[in-house]
Amino acid sequence: MIVLALDVYEREKALSIAEDVKDYISMIKVNWPLIIGSGLGVISELKKKTGLPIIADLKLADIPNTNRLIAKKVYDAGADYIILHSFVGRDSVKAVKELGEIIMIVEMSHPGALEFINPLTDKFIDMANEIKPFGVIAPGTRPERIRYIRERLSKDIKVLTPGIGAQGGSPVEALKAGADYIIIGRAIYNAERPREAAKKIFEEVKEWSSR
């Protein structure tokens, strides 16, 4: 249920944290800071170190051919999933899905998203229901929006929610609203003892799910 967002630059730091918390997480999400700072090879290193699936959070948003070229390299490097924007349209999204599993962004939580992305949430949900990605991204800081998206999304499509922890989102509230995976970064990797931080969240989630 817990996805660790490793938004750090340093390879050694990323590998150390990942190994430290692997017992309490389900997947690892790498973003541009780590890929730029350490190279694509860090994806396979993380998989080898932890045995966990890797999400490449590239937020791809280009024409089909460019999306395809980028995605091929990232999947070849060992990524299990790629996150991409929906607003570029079906052709660009499908170009990536032809190569591997995808996670589509249907809504974001930052203020700027209200201008262009969030007004199209319903269209993005319809697109996801048609294309059948592994999952979609929904704002973990807004349980009411998680619930809205979950109710309109095919049951076989997972809901992943960033913004848990440092940004104010509650792990249990996100799960109650319909999230399948909660994405947590700073609350774990910036903690004085990342393993203990991950364990605490894991136990909180486990206690709720066993009720």
Curated annotation (Swiss-Prot):
SUPFAM superfamilies per record: Ribulose-phoshate binding barrel
Gene Ontology CC entries for this record: cytosol
Pathway: Pyrimidine metabolism; UMP biosynthesis via de novo pathway; UMP from orotate: step 2/2
Residues binding substrate, per UniProt: 7, 29, 57-66, 109, 162-172, 185-186
CDD domains, per database record: OMP_decarboxylase_like (cd04725)
Source domain of life: Archaea
SMART domains named among the record's database cross-references: OMPdecase (SM00934)
Catalytic residue positions: 59 (proton donor)
Keyword Repeat: no
Catalytic activity: orotidine 5'-phosphate + H(+) = UMP + CO2
EC nos: 4.1.1.23
GO biological process: 'de novo' pyrimidine nucleobase biosynthetic process; 'de novo' UMP biosynthetic process
Keywords, sorted A to Z: Decarboxylase, Lyase, Pyrimidine biosynthesis
Molecular function terms from GO: orotidine-5'-phosphate decarboxylase activity
InterPro entries referenced in this protein's UniProt entry, alphabetically: Aldolase_TIM, OMPdecase, OMPdecase_arc, OMPdecase_AS, OMPdeCOase_dom, RibuloseP-bd_barrel
One Pfam family of this chain: OMPdecase
Subunit structure: Homodimer.
Reported function: Catalyzes the decarboxylation of orotidine 5'-monophosphate (OMP) to uridine 5'-monophosphate (UMP).
Family according to the record: Belongs to the OMP decarboxylase family. Type 1 subfamily.
PANTHER family: OROTIDINE 5'-PHOSPHATE DECARBOXYLASE
HAMAP family named among the record's database cross-references: OMPdecase_type1_A
Name used for this protein in its record: Orotidine 5'-phosphate decarboxylase
